[in-house]
């Protein structure tokens, strides 16, 4: 097929407003998601210039990064956090933006509540002043993070100047074995191509293992596209996508729904379309994963050992490994199942959806959090929290000794009151294990919700495929 296009190319082409020769094209933005951290300066810029919002009906705001997961009271916030959430509330009032504040039943992490409200739709361009905006690509949307100056530009014009990215296909063939989740799939991918293997690309995830995932699982995979350096991650929409979106608040209704689905079905990579790069993995080879170092690419299977830098031929990589081991406080050759933890965090925009909490609850039910371990569970949104409580998951966690919290970004990043102390070692379902990410001197191991819950009750990492 001469004019065969990839999924990304189709969405890109449909959104070009103008493409002057020698300049970056201008693309249209369908949805703009806003939170309290990266928006204040953008709104201030509009006020100084006397500009209005170009499309307030396509702008959605929430409070998530700085909010307390212990109390919905403003008094629970630090002075800086309180200033940020109050500033967002005032800006939304001044500019007519829909806001899901800390008292709204649908408030939550921006990348959790957006999809569950039907704001995220196939074939759209979605931006947010947040690096994990790629999450929304699970629906066949082109979604990526932007900086504060770009936030202001989108608020004012509903457009962005963007250079077209290269295309990469990551195909995960076959089916995973028991105990292997979407988190393990994406960690295995990053382990294979590295934390910069996707730089300059928009990645399309495909293959039987991806198609078999729920929308929650696909969101987990696309969420971490940025952790392999990619601009965005995408999965072609299919019946799983349509079933998830049907009836959601901002999804099309009636005849509009029928027309939308017909259009969405065409948003897929054509036979014969050529990618700039192709990566293949066999799902059957993927075991439960966990990181050992200080970036998501420093990852091994649970039945493996901490790698030895001496076996690395590349001097730069070897030095990076040595530095990571020094910070993380591990010795080469240590079995991963011998690593003890004292903190567990189940939450974040990567793994705080209902499927994630159900998976974790399986390993918490009838057990107790190990002595000396503090474990918290933070639902990704008010909707997730309500559903989990309706299913009795909160009781399972509480009876096992986990703390059950309010929605928010929480311990993913040391920007609120949920943070690690120096020397703490945490099994975390978040997306980044950089030095100090969860608190100064903190040591983070990225895992799936099931692996995190199992570590909480065992006091160390375990292979959830085996009795423990």
Curated annotation (Swiss-Prot):
Heterodimer of LeuC and LeuD. InterPro entries: 3-IsopropMal_deHydase_lsu, Acnase/IPM_dHydase_lsu_aba_1/3, Acoase/IPM_deHydtase_lsu_aba, Aconitase_4Fe-4S_BS, Aconitase_4Fe-4S_dom, IPM_dehydratase_rel_enz, IPMI_cat. HAMAP family: LeuC_type1 (MF_01026). The lineage of its organism: Bacteria, Pseudomonadati, Pseudomonadota, Gammaproteobacteria, Alteromonadales. Its cofactor is [4Fe-4S] cluster. The keyword Iron applies. One of its GO terms (molecular function) is metal ion binding. This is 3-isopropylmalate dehydratase large subunit. GO terms for biological process: L-leucine biosynthetic process. Binds 1 [4Fe-4S] cluster per subunit. It catalyses: (2R,3S)-3-isopropylmalate = (2S)-2-isopropylmalate. Belongs to the aconitase/IPM isomerase family. LeuC type 1 subfamily. Its EC number is 4.2.1.33. [4Fe-4S] cluster binds at residues 349, 409, 412. Keywords: 4Fe-4S, Amino-acid biosynthesis, Branched-chain amino acid biosynthesis, Iron, Iron-sulfur, Leucine biosynthesis, Lyase, Metal-binding. Catalyzes the isomerization between 2-isopropylmalate and 3-isopropylmalate, via the formation of 2-isopropylmaleate. Pathway: Amino-acid biosynthesis; L-leucine biosynthesis; L-leucine from 3-methyl-2-oxobutanoate: step 2/4.
């Amino acid at each position: 097929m001469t004019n065969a296009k990839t999924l990304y190319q189709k969405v890109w082409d449909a959104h070009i407003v103008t493409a002057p020769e020698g300049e970056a094209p201008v693309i249209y933005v369908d949805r703009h998601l806003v939170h309290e951290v990266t928006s204040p300066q953008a709104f201030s810029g509009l006020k100084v210039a006397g500009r209005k919002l170009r499309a307030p009906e396509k702008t959605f705001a929430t409070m998530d990064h700085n909010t307390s997961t212990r109390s919905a009271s403003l008094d629970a916030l630090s002075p800086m956090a309180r200033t940020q959430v109050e500033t967002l509330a005032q800006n939304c009032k001044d500019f007519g933006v829909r806001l899901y504040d800390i008292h709204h039943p649908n408030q939550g992490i921006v990348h959790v509540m957006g999809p569950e409200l039907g704001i995220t739709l196939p074939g759209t361009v979605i931006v947010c002043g947040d690096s994990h905006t790629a999450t929304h690509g699970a629906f066949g949307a082109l979604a990526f993070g932007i900086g504060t100056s770009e936030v202001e530009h989108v608020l004012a014009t509903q457009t962005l100047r963007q250079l077209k990215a290269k295309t990469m296909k990551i195909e995960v063939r076959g089916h995973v074995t028991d105990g292997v989740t979407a988190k393990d799939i994406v960690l295995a991918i990053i382990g294979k191509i590295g934390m910069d293997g996707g730089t300059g690309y928009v990645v399309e995830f495909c293959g039987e293992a991806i198609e078999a995932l729920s929308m929650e699982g696909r969101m987990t995979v696309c969420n971490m596209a940025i952790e392999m350096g990619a601009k965005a991650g995408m999965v072609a929409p299919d019946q799983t996508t349509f079933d998830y979106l049907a009836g959601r608040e901002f999804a099309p209704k009636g005849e509009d729904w029928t027309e939308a689905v017909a259009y969405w079905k065409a948003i897929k990579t054509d036979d014969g379309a050529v990618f700039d790069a192709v990566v293949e993995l066999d799902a059957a080879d993927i075991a439960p994963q966990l990181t050992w170092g200080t970036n998501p690419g420093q990852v091994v299977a649970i039945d493996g050992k901490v790698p030895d830098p001496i076996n690395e031929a590349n001097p730069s990589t070897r030095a990076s490994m040595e530095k990571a081991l020094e910070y993380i406080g591990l010795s080469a050759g240590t079995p991963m199942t011998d690593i003890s933890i004292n903190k567990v965090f189940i939450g974040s925009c990567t793994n705080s959806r209902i499927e994630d909490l159900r998976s974790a609850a399986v390993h918490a039910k009838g057990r107790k959090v190990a002595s000396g371990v503090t474990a918290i569970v933070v639902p990704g949104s008010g909707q997730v929290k309500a559903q989990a409580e309706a299913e009795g998951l909160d009781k399972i966690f509480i009876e096992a000794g986990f703390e059950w919290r309010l929605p928010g970004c929480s311990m993913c990043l040391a920007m609120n009151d949920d943070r690690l102390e120096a020397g703490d070692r945490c099994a975390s379902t978040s997306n980044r294990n950089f030095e100090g990410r969860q608190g100064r001197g903190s040591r983070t191991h990225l895992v799936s919700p099931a692996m995190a819950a199992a570590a909480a009750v065992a006091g160390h990492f375990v292979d959830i495929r085996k009795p423990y």
